[in-house]
Amino acid sequence: MDFRKAFDSIRHDKLLQAVQQEGVKGNFFASIKSMYDSLLSCVRANNDYSDFFECPVGVRQGCVVSPTIFSLFINQLAKYITDTGRHGIQLLLGLTELFILLFADDVALLATTPCGLQNQLDSLKVCCDRLKMEVNKDETKVMVFRKGGHLSKHENGIMMALKWK
């Protein structure tokens, strides 16, 4: 799954809320908050600088804590799917269930049935709406793994019917 401008479009209020929900508090949270409160930027073209303008969205580029802060933010997707009781694939019978893979701004949902995948997509849509994240549908793909053979027309039709509502 591909998010449209994931690093550049995160609202700071949602970012700080996610950091706080992950248990960051005290002086460290205050430091992060101060980095994003009334963040100002300007544009340099050749040797000229624009006027400063407020930037209410995006993680700070080049900041050493930005990848960690973004990871805390994107982890909200996994937590939401877990909290809604969605199911993934069993790795160890009855012990380990895997339903989402996260790496930076890349997300892979894992399900054993098309219906299960649709349920995860529905949950993810609710969470993305809440976090104000936009999925790039044109860059998002479905991949099916199965034991042998090609997908039947029926199975292929089911996979094509999956929708980002």
Task: Report each predicted region and the residues it spans.
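Nucleotidyl polymerases of mobile genetic elements and RNA viruses
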Residues: M1-K165
